[in-house]
Each structure stands twice: as C-alpha cells, then as structure tokens.
Amino acid sequence: MLQISNLLLAADFSAEVANNSAVGMIGSFIAAALLIVIPATAFLIFVSQKDSLDRTSTGRR
C-alpha cells in the first residue's frame, strides 16, 4: 500500500484533482440513478400492478 502511495505522490497528483474526480464520479452515479434506475423501476412497478389488476378482473368473469 505504501508503494502505491509513493507512486501517486511521485506522479504529482494533487488533492484537488482527486477531489474533483470523486465529485464527478458521484455525480455520474446520481445521474445514472435519475436517468435509468428510477424510471425503469417506476415502469416495472406500473406494469406489475396493471398485470395484477388484469389477472384479478379476468378471474372474476
């Protein structure tokens, strides 16, 4: 672990660059959740509820 730390220090990585990279990565995760995961979850819940209602109403006929 110490070797990796020394390598990063020797490569002149600054804390500001690392911080900006981490903020960008977290922002990407949030954007992915908003654009992909949440709409897909809402769609699957909607479809499963609709299917449940269709099966219930079909069974009563």
From Swiss-Prot:
**GO cellular component terms, semicolon-separated:** photosystem II; plasma membrane-derived thylakoid membrane
Q: Which UniProt keywords apply?
A: Membrane, Photosynthesis, Photosystem II, Thylakoid, Transmembrane, Transmembrane helix
Q: Which GO terms describe its biological process?
A: photosynthesis
- Locations listed in the record: Cellular thylakoid membrane
Source organism's superkingdom? Bacteria
Keyword flag Transmembrane: yes
Q: What stretches pass through the bilayer?
A: 26-46
Topological relation to the membrane, as annotated: Single-pass membrane protein
UniProt subunit comment? PSII consists of a core antenna complex that captures photons, and an electron transfer chain that converts photonic excitation into a charge separation. PSII forms dimeric complexes.
Homology family: Belongs to the PsbX family. Type 2 subfamily.
Summary of the function given for this chain in its UniProt record:
Involved in the binding and/or turnover of quinones at the Q(B) site of Photosystem II.
- This chain's protein is named Photosystem II reaction center X protein
Q: What is the lineage of its organism?
A: Bacteria, Bacillati, Cyanobacteriota, Cyanophyceae, Synechococcales
